Amino acid sequence: MLETCKDLEQQGYEVTYLKPDKTGHIAVDDLRAALRPDTALVSMMLVNNELGTVFPIAQCVQAVKDYDKGILFHCDAVQGFLKLPTVLTGLGTDLVTVSGHKLGAPKGVGALYVKKGVRLRPLLTGGGQEEGLRSGTEATAQIAGFAEACRQIMADRTRLERMQAIKDYALDRLKAEIPKLEVISTGDAPHICAVTLPGYKSEVVVRVLGDPGGGI
């Protein structure tokens, strides 16, 4: 989102960036303080992809709507879609973006949730596909692959517990093998674990992870 915000600034828009704390959290009070009479859009991640921080989207939406119901709220849910016990449409957001590649679906396909009553101007015009929002022939195979990935994940009712168990096991093993290991992830998300290895050169770690049994 940062690069998109920079593009908007080049077009003359003013963008306010909220500073997170050391765990990546954004305070709802900081969001309230940043709102202005001319604020048009608020955009926030659902899950930080580096630290696993889960943002209080529902509370943030409420704060924004209490200030001005006309401000649109967009949530980048790419890292949290179907990986949290969260119903995205229950967050109260106006717009939600998700991506297929995070779920094992084909690359290059995603989805945009648009709340009923919200009107958007298309960036691509032409044939009027996808309800006029994105003209051009649809990538049917990618869309079908995305839908099937969602169906399979939603049918696996133990997936969240399994992800958490795998993360807990990995952390326990890492701590036992590497006493100096430091955990920097927040623990909010069940599928993200971030650590640092003091005293180990990054290129050595990368080389080890590239060996059989490892992965990058």
Which residues are covered by each model-predicted region?
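Pyridoxal 5′-phosphate
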Residues: M1-I216
